[in-house]
Amino acid sequence: MKPELEKLCADYIANRDTVGKVFKWDSNDLYTVCANVFCACGQTADTDRLKECREVIKKHTRLFSKFRSKKVRSILASMLSLVEKPEERMTLANDYFSLLKRHFKGTEYLVLTAFLLADLADQTLTEETALRGKQIYRRMNQKHRILTNKTDSVFAMLMAFSGKSEDELTEEVEAGYLVLKKHFSNSGASQTAAQVFSMTGGLPEEKAQRLNDLYDALTEAEIKYGHADELAPLAALSISDTPIPTLVEEIKEADEFLKDQKGYGTKEDELKKRALHAVMIVSDQYQGTDQVNVTLMTNTLDMLFAKQQASRFSFAVHVVEALLKMVAASHEGKEETKVETDNKSDAQKQPEE
């Protein structure tokens, strides 16, 4: 392993653990995203700085603000800790959020979008750009109503800042999607990957085919890489012009490093997660690391919402089961009472001998 990659691997683990100490009750998956935010900038997470930025978020928001949500607060604090004036950045993100809320639902996805746009030093969010983002999102929804969700609103706004027309963006996303969906069973993941490609130069079909080739090369190298939420980060890495064999070798080296670290098991899902984190680390060396981080943030939000819904569903099932048992018990009690009453009635009706 080359020294640069080895350092990134070590920094990733250190950053993950530092964020975990500050946000003890948040999801482990968020710690990994935050760790890569720091690695992508060549910075190290600092406990005191993170705590300071957590207070900045509280200072500039109300009690039940989406900015304080456990699904995003660690990511936001990490991003704030990297800028010289976090209070100014927080104010700008708040202003952007207010503007975006006129066109999109005020969810954690929109909070994340506002922060990402506030990080674009050479761009300014205007009413016109927000409307353009909304129009791009509507086009996505019209084209693939079932596949399009809140995650796509983040990409729609980022796409709105590209120099391409709405027609060009829509056509490129569709062209890339058609190539990818022949190769991968997850249509939603294919659409997100195609959106990542639309924000870069080159022919969409060629970019999609390069992703197919990279994925196949990972499979041949016996690296367990998923093709659901994991696909978009791999697409962002594939934007790099680094030869595929080099990327595969580095991903394998990072994967081997993570194998010996705390938090990685041997189940299939855990192997896929480990490979995803290896891709994250490798991407920090190349063009496309910003897109990797965006896909990681949105995918992690999706996962956290899915877990929340599953938890609510599980709770609802338990409640229903308990109610059914109560009804059944009540019914049995009534039946027993009825039997006893009938027996007494029969006994009273029997003639004396």
Predicted features, each with a name:
Residues 2, 7, 21-24, 51, ...:
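Context-gated lysine
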Residues 1-91, 98-112, 281-284, 305-331:
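N-terminal domain-start signal
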Residues 40-48, 82-88, 120-127, 164-166, ...:
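Short coil/turn connectors between adjacent alpha-helices in alpha-solenoid helical repeat scaffolds
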